[in-house]
């Protein structure tokens, strides 16, 4: 594909992410094309259909977040972590898109969030191999828990924010309010001992044995 085509492809995708995030998935291809500075025919040329365009947006958003998370978890350099935090407002279009996906539901939304869970399992494993993340008894379940609570928690925070339509401000405030408490829980733990965990684990294992 010619470089000009690649540039148009990326420009359309970026405009679509912004338009979907701002107006919802009911926005038309003509509006997306206008925002990208191209014709609706060129959108179809690159993506085939509106569903194809949304799928491309899903893939891009999921990969951008996976890449960012992996870089943070594999690094021992505070400069990397603080640099990402300084740029958190730049993630506003991606987060607006994810919020719309959570709110819209449907098969495409389920597919996107399944991909997010898959990616979480992948970057957590990268952290384990890098020695920055503790191994898990059940890596898949841990990834699912973190992806769902992370996405749902941000959605709830956004609903409680004084200006929920301003994603840049919401992300800035979210980082201020939530990063240190979450890091404390992840790093120091919450419960004073393993008694509750061991009790529920034994119960789960006993149930699995009965099923087997």
From Swiss-Prot:
<dbReference type="InterPro" id="IPR041484">
    <property type="entry name" value="TetR_C_25"/>
</dbReference>
<dbReference type="InterPro" id="IPR001647">
    <property type="entry name" value="HTH_TetR"/>
</dbReference>
<dbReference type="GO" id="GO:0000976">
    <property type="term" value="F:transcription cis-regulatory region binding"/>
</dbReference>
<dbReference type="InterPro" id="IPR036271">
    <property type="entry name" value="Tet_transcr_reg_TetR-rel_C_sf"/>
</dbReference>
<dbReference type="InterPro" id="IPR009057">
    <property type="entry name" value="Homeodomain-like_sf"/>
</dbReference>
<feature type="DNA-binding region" description="H-T-H motif">
    <location>
        <begin position="28"/>
        <end position="47"/>
    </location>
</feature>
<dbReference type="Pfam" id="PF17933">
    <property type="entry name" value="TetR_C_25"/>
</dbReference>
<dbReference type="InterPro" id="IPR050109">
    <property type="entry name" value="HTH-type_TetR-like_transc_reg"/>
</dbReference>
<comment type="subunit">
    <text>Homodimer. Interacts with long chain acyl-CoA derivatives. Interacts with several drugs such rhodamine 6G, ethidium and safranin O.</text>
</comment>
<keyword id="KW-0804">Transcription</keyword>
<dbReference type="GO" id="GO:0006355">
    <property type="term" value="P:regulation of DNA-templated transcription"/>
</dbReference>
<dbReference type="Pfam" id="PF00440">
    <property type="entry name" value="TetR_N"/>
</dbReference>
<keyword id="KW-0805">Transcription regulation</keyword>
<comment type="function">
    <text>Regulates the expression of the Rv1217c-Rv1218c multidrug efflux system and its own expression. Acts by binding to promoter regions of Rv1219c and upstream of the Rv1218c gene. Important for survival in prolonged stationary phase and during macrophage infection. May be used to eliminate non-growing mycobacteria.</text>
</comment>
<dbReference type="GO" id="GO:0003700">
    <property type="term" value="F:DNA-binding transcription factor activity"/>
</dbReference>
<protein>
    <recommendedName>
        <fullName>HTH-type transcriptional regulatory protein RaaS</fullName>
    </recommendedName>
</protein>
<keyword id="KW-0678">Repressor</keyword>
<feature type="domain" description="HTH tetR-type">
    <location>
        <begin position="6"/>
        <end position="65"/>
    </location>
</feature>
<keyword id="KW-0238">DNA-binding</keyword>
């Amino acid at each position: 594909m010619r470089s000009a085509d690649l540039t148009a492809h990326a420009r359309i995708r970026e405009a679509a992410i912004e338009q979907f995030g701002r107006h919802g998935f009911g926005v038309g291809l003509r509006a997306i094309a206008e925002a990208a500075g191209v014709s609706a025919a060129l959108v179809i040329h690159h993506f085939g259909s509106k569903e194809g365009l949304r799928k491309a947006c899903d893939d891009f958003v999921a990969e951008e977040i996976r890449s960012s998370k992996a870089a943070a978890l594999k690094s021992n350099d505070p400069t990397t972590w603080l640099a990402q935090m300084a740029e958190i407002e730049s993630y506003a279009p991606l987060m607006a898109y994810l919020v719309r996906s959570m709110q819209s539901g449907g098969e495409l939304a389920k597919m996107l969030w399944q991909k997010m869970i898959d990616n979480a399992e992948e970057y957590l494993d990268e952290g384990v191999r890098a020695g920055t993340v503790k191994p898990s008894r059940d890596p898949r379940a841990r990834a699912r828990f973190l992806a769902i609570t992370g996405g749902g928690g941000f959605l709830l925070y956004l609903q409680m924010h004084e200006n929920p339509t301003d994603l840049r401000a919401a992300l800035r405030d979210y980082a201020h309010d939530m990063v240190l408490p979450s890091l404390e829980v992840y790093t120091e733990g919450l419960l004073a001992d393993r008694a509750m965990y061991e009790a529920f684990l034994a119960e789960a294992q006993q149930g699995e044995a009965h099923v087997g």
